[in-house]
Amino acid sequence: MKQAYLDLDLIQLSTENAAVHLNKEFVLIDNLDEVPEQTNMEMEFVNHPVKLSFTIAIFCLTGRMSVQINLQEFELRANDILIVLEGSIGEYRGMSDDTRIAVIAFSSEYFQTALQVDATMSLQHKLYSSPFYHLSPAAMEETMAIYRLMKAKIAETDNPFRKGVLLGYTQVLTYNSYKYLLAADADDGKLNGKSGRQQELYTRFIREVQKSYTKERSISYYANVLCVTPKYLSQVV
């Protein structure tokens, strides 16, 4: 019986033709320097669902790219970002000939940042429920500048501190992402107060996160600990 999806890990992703990586745990892929007839990025998992064992961020600079994430369809255009968390099931459908993209894929270790634990988990949930958002041209320009710094740092094979630097750059991108999402929430009027019961659950959730975050990062795990459904916990946090 054919498996419903392929398991995709960073080791496999790091073997793609356009990939550069650090220890097969931090992978960059782009077609920014290619001419139009070379932009068709051939990947063995095109048009087949894959389950991700890592987090991936896709930045679209021009053109159109079609993907499906957890059965939801997305079309990326200029200055769009799609951030897909570990455990998601996605499918790459294709892109237009004029598409320019940059991809950052990394293990969960790189998602740990200097953000407070509650802010980090809040960002993680927001990205799980709403992985797609649009950047201003200036914000995308800053993001691509950081991407190029990451790529240059990976190329410094004689530098023993590359991982630390990449962790730092990832922190910058995470802070920026959280800022963009908070601004989007404010613009959309989505910041609603929690009821007393929800606030109590949220407080317990944060307490559990502080105890177990280095080992457990999934909403499902904490929902089980708190004896609620993952869906309800996601709505609260």
State the predicted function of each range:
Residues 79, 233-234:
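Short hydrophobic/aromatic patch on the recognition helix
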Residues 71-86:
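Short acidic-glycine-tyrosine-enriched beta hairpin
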Residues 3-4, 93-154:
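A hydrophobic/aromatic-rich effector-binding and dimerization subdomain
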Residues 1-65, 72-74:
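Generic protein-terminus/edge-of-domain signal
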